[in-house]
Regions:
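Structured, mid-chain assembly/scaffold modules that mediate subunit interfaces
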Residues: 32-196
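Intrinsic disorder/low-complexity signature
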Residues: 3-6, 28-30, 46
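Intrinsically disordered, low-structural-confidence terminal and linker regions
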Residues: 1-18
Length: 196
């Protein structure tokens, strides 16, 4: 049931992370899973339909080779693919899987940055930990950690009347229409005001 998950989400995440950091068996289970699932990571194998494009087989091979090279250039350099500039594409995949295994969720935002001479690619991926997806305080009476409160979007805001469960807004049919991502982590000591 929804209540079992939402009301205990924060505790489950804390325990999973504690086990990962303190119990070698749990650490090995997650790391082995990561290695077996991700392996060498996703790679691009371009294959264009040259007949639809009206190009010769040589032109198709040339385009495919160029596309694969561009992908490798983007994916291999952490400044190219990671919004925080910390991981290359393979490491982002590993991070996302580990976060999902420990937290039950992980979110990836696609961001655009201005191209630069040494960094011509504008697309960056930003991995968001599940903890940052939470119900805004003005929806839930001031409590957000774990975000388990079943809240309703207030009148005057887009989506008024929709329900919010643990930072996920759903319409009357149960379709996900929005995610509320906080700019800070729960219980983070900061002078920054928490916003969604």
């Amino acid at each position: 049931p929804n209540e079992d998950i939402n009301r205990n989400n924060a505790t489950l995440r804390q325990r999973a992370r504690m086990l990962y950091m303190a119990a070698p068996v749990a650490t090995a289970a997650i790391n082995t899973n990561r290695t077996k699932v991700i392996g060498t990571g996703l790679t691009l194998k371009a294959s264009v339909d040259r007949e639809v494009l009206g190009i010769s087989p040589e032109a198709a091979k040339k385009w495919q080779h160029a596309a694969e090279m561009e992908f490798r250039l983007w994916a291999g350099k952490k400044q190219n693919c990671d919004a925080l500039g910390l991981n290359n594409f393979m490491a982002l995949q590993q991070l996302a899987l580990k976060s999902w295994l420990m937290s039950g969720d992980v979110f990836v935002l696609v961001k655009r940055y201005p191209a630069a001479p040494l960094n011509p690619y504008s697309m960056r991926l930003h991995v968001i930990e599940a903890d940052r997806v939470s119900t805004p305080t003005n929806f839930s009476g001031g409590y957000t950690y774990g975000g388990f409160m079943d809240a309703v979007v207030p009148d005057g805001k887009p989506g008024a009347g929709h329900r919010v469960f643990d930072g996920v807004e759903v319409d009357k049919n149960g379709r996900v229409v929005a995610y509320y991502i906080s700019n800070t982590y729960p219980h983070q000591i900061t002078t920054e005001k928490q916003e969604w």
